Amino acid sequence: METIIIALIAFIIGIIAIPIVLFAWIYIKDEKQQEHSILRNYPVIGRFRYILEKIGPELRQYLYSNDNEEQPFSRKEYEQTVISGKYKSRMMGFGSVRDFDKPGYYIRNAMFPKQREEMHVNQTPKIETQIYKMDADNLFKRKEHAEHIKADPYFLHPDDVQVIGEHTCEKPFYVKGLVGQSAMSYGSLGERAVTALSKGLHLAGGTWMNTGEGGLSEYHLKGGADIICQIGPGLFGVRKRNGEFSWEEFKRKSRIDQIKAFELKLAQGAKTRGGHVDGAKVSEEVADIRNVEPGKSIDSPNRFYEFSNPPEMLDFIEKLRDVGQKPVGIKLVAGHPEELHELFSHMQKSGKHPDFITIDGSEGGTGASFYELADTVGLPIMTALPIVDTLLKQYGLRSQLKIFASGKLLTPDKIAVALALGADFVNIARGMMFSVGCIRALVCHTNTCPAGVATTDPKLQKALSVEEKQHRVCNYVISLREGLFNLAAAAGINSPIHFSKEHVVYRKEDGSIINIDNLIHQFVS
């Protein structure tokens, strides 16, 4: 009995003493450390500041921010993308949550919109995909089931199919839709994410997948999607070990049937310099594809060594097109109008030009960049796009090439505005990431993505089911195309290819409206 009493007393003393000793140890440690000022003045209790600071982003995202408040994407934009991918639905009730007092773009509606049967749309063949149906949704229970359906594809009418490189190369690219995946490299994304995207885009049809500057991987090809193969200043995928351009490797890539076009990346909206991939993401496989050393961070050159001015670049494009026999375009960020004048002037005088120009807005996404570049450098897409379109028309070049636009254009309304401002096609990256599970954790650059999307870590990637996510990608693309036809009908045109500047106005904060031509006149005069 005495032994039990002694043990009980010792246990009670331990219960009391251990927290006191632990508190004292933390107190002394905090008071003597030199890294954090708050902890030196407020030992122990000051730690709550850092705990709240750590969980603050999650609290704001899930509890405190309103539907239109967050950046780079609001809860409304995120949910619209996720719901259209999971349920293939864009329906809402009661009314818009848009703040109509703020300045912004609006689509002019027609007094007599087009009837459904008047729309120039191709609904064959049907697309076999999977959607979810909600059975019960309350505070403590959500029950839903998956259904296989045959969905309308919302392809462009055969008469409206867009052709890239029609008069310049032996193998032009025929496109039945206006929306595709923007550049995202394997290495920035994991193999499961890339595979799910490839399979989903192939299911949707009439679209494309841009490889990003990291080079072509087997995962891009795995699903069968049409590919635009991007070549950045690092020349990944088309380089020799010493970093020089390999014409043999380029020729080999150009013989792959899935590759429909090539794109030279001059710049990216979020980083108008060379790309960066942290060493933690550079696995053996990533290194092999890029022809670099594994485990070491990769920093691409800020620009191509192969050319340094418009004439040299246009000559390089001509050679790529001659060797590859496929369309070649450039990706740029609009900055100085004078530089655009110089480039387009050389195109006009020489008769040489790319088959397409991708304009990336400064608001575009990235796997890794510097704050100062992402926040400040380059023009936003809705400003840059009409400038480039207008200048191309001034130089008589607009009919000779296509324009791709990218930069937070992940809903049908924003895509329609971009088309009206001069785009022929729209690229989407982060919307595609949402459709394969991205939760906006904002840790793409760390290889610790909790959803298994922007990581090459096998343990984290197991979260992503390729077979399930491919359907969400497919549904998202179909929903975007359907939304574009809905908006076209409302604007009184029979296809979204007919959106033009006359269909859009910009409303100022004082309530007055500006026609787009007047809005951009000062930049291109």
Swiss-Prot record:
It comes from the Bacteria. The chain crosses the membrane at residues 4-24. GO terms for biological process: glutamate biosynthetic process. The keyword Transferase does not apply. GO terms for cellular component: plasma membrane. InterPro entries: Aldolase_TIM (IPR013785), GltB (IPR024188), Glu_synthdom (IPR002932), YerD (IPR027283). It is a single-pass membrane protein. One of its GO terms (molecular function) is glutamate synthase activity. It is found in: Cell membrane. Pfam families: Glu_synthase. Its main location: membrane. Keywords: Cell membrane, Membrane, Transmembrane, Transmembrane helix. Belongs to the glutamate synthase family. This is Glutamate synthase large subunit-like protein YerD. It comes from Bacillus subtilis (strain 168).
